A protein has these predicted regions:
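Conserved active-site neighborhood of the chymotrypsin/trypsin-like protease fold
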Residues: 20-24, 51-53, 65, 70-152, ...
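Active-site-proximal beta-strands of protease catalytic cores
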Residues: 43-47, 77-81, 136-147, 177, ...
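PDZ-domain C-terminal substructure recognizer with occasional recognition of PDZ-binding tails
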Residues: 103, 231-238, 266, 272-275, ...
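A short, Trp-centered hydrophobic/proline-enriched beta-strand micro-motif
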Residues: 38-55, 59
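Gly/Ser-rich catalytic serine loop of serine hydrolases
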Residues: 64-68, 127-132, 174-192, 265-271
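Flexible, gly/ser-rich surface segments that form the specificity/activation loops bordering the active-site cleft
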Residues: 61, 126-172, 205-211, 229-242
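Conserved PDZ fold ligand-binding element
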Residues: 73-78, 193-197, 269-292
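C-terminal cap/linker of serine protease catalytic domains
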Residues: 1-36, 124, 150, 192, ...
Length: 337
């Protein structure tokens, strides 16, 4: 069962199973302020099932589990998108253990946010959005999963910096927190005023940043990243802006080089004949400095469907290949489609 992404190439984290596992590994928090204590009931459990023939099933699993946060009085829940990607069933569990069927409302690949809605709204108070820009180095906050105070951990912000994911994902000003929360996917980053500041995405081994000693923590997607796209995502399920070009490459940096660590089966790079272990040097004649530079140059090339020329290296031989980019959202199925 996939329970969240981590920073390695295996794609799925392996936290403890269910609420009991979280409680067993957390010390608990006492003397919570009233705003925080009241907000915790909005954190819900989320389970999804994914058909075996869906493309994400191999890497993320056919059963996924994490958290979400109730954000309105009509059952709307925000979570991290990979938990609901290609799911055909969604079940929400509230703080009292009630299981509520839900359905996918929207998923934004660029930010990573996912939205689902319960068929019947849970009888709990929703959490309001806060201002994630208020968080800076050493700011204090709480990380919460379903279960109230027993599933809550006090954390500090270890950094605010750019995060480049190997799956063609780039997030400005991501929030890194310590210590690590064991079941991070979709968990709530709650401000001291009880507002929602971020949604849990990753377990990372270098939460303190480049050049600092390795120290495990979590990466949270800032809630301010959701605000400008929220209304359209609720109304349409995805954004109407032209989709970014997508290659279907999983890229890692190794000894100063950009190396293909994996390829999406049937995606643009796969169809063009690229292989795991290939080294990327340039895109449309422009040298690639690092992964963020690669993504920015790819996305600046035009909308999805644009053809790009990659200069590659394989077994010490250089070659060029033209790849017709695709739309990631069309590669994956949406809900029960």
């Amino acid at each position: 069962m996939a329970r969240g992404l981590n920073g390695s190439m295996n794609g799925a984290g392996h936290g403890p199973t269910g609420r009991e596992g979280v409680e067993a590994r957390l010390p608990g928090v006492s003397n919570l302020s009233p705003p925080v204590a009241q907000a915790l009931s909005a954190v819900v459990g989320l389970k999804t099932t994914i058909p075996k023939d869906r493309r994400s099933a191999q890497t993320l699993g056919t059963e996924r589990e994490g958290h979400g946060v109730l954000i309105d009085d009509k059952g709307l829940v925000v979570t991290i998108g990979y938990l609901i990607m290609e799911a055909d069933t969604v079940t929400i569990t509230d703080i009292d253990g009630r299981e509520l069927p839900a359905y996918i409302v929207g998923y934004d690949y660029e930010s990573g946010f996912g939205l689902v809605r319960t068929v019947v709204p849970p009888p709990v108070r929703p959490m309001t959005f806060g201002d994630s820009d208020s968080l800076s180095l050493r700011s204090e906050a709480y990380v919460a999963g379903v279960g109230g105070e027993k599933a809550t951990l006090k954390v500090k912000v270890a950094g605010r910096r750019e995060f480049a994911g190997y799956w063609e994902y780039l997030l400005d000003n991501a929030i890194f927190t310590v210590p690590a929360y064991p079941l991070w996917g979709g968990s709530a980053l709650v401000g001291m005023d009880g507002t929602l500041l971020g949604v849990g995405s990753l377990l990372v081994q270098e939460a303190l940043g480049p050049g600092a000693p390795a120290f495990p923590g979590n990466m949270y997607v800032p809630i301010n990243r959701l605000k400008p796209i929220f209304d359209e995502l609720v109304a349409k399920g995805r954004l109407s802006t032209p989709p970014r070009p997508w290659l279907g490459l999983l890229t890692v940096e190794h000894m100063g080089q950009l190396v293909v660590g994996g390829i999406s089966d049937g995606g643009p790079a796969d169809r063009a004949g690229l292989q795991r272990g290939d080294v990327l040097h340039a895109l449309d004649g422009e040298v690639l400095d690092d992964i963020p530079d690669f993504y920015r140059k790819l996305w600046a090339s035009g909308p999805a469907g644009t053809a790009v020329t990659l200069r590659m290296e394989r077994d010490n031989d250089s070659f060029e290949v033209t790849v017709r980019t695709g739309d990631r959202a069309r590669y994956h199925k949406f809900g029960s489609d």
